[in-house]
């Protein structure tokens, strides 16, 4: 429901959002068949991975023990595995849901 609301709210009109991305959700994204997550955008988080993990540690009700996908160790491994795909130490990945082009722009 939230996903559909975002798509409606970000329709390309006079004042529009340039791009809408979905993010990888540990222990949820992999259960979304047949619409599984397919990363197409990588952001280098090598310098901020430990800050991300410290922030996640504040959400004790969301954390689980390793090897659960939402354990701190699993999140670290996941970020490093995504990063390795682009020769980075760690990365956060996104999937483009919609990308609107400005006048004269061409798709990448």
Where in this protein do the model-derived segments appear?
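Metal-dependent de-N-acetylase/amidase catalytic core
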Residues: 1-108
């Amino acid at each position: 429901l939230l996903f559909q609301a975002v798509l409606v709210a970000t329709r390309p009109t006079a004042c529009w959002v340039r791009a809408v991305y979905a993010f990888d959700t540990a222990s949820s994204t992999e259960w979304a068949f047949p619409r599984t997550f397919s990363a197409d955008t990588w952001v280098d988080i090598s310098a901020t991975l430990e800050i991300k993990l410290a922030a996640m540690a504040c959400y004790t009700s969301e954390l689980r023990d390793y090897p659960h996908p939402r354990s701190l160790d699993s999140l670290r491994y996941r970020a490093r595995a995504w990063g390795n795909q682009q020769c980075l130490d760690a990365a956060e990945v996104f999937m483009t849901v919609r990308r609107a082009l400005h006048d004269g722009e061409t798709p990448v």
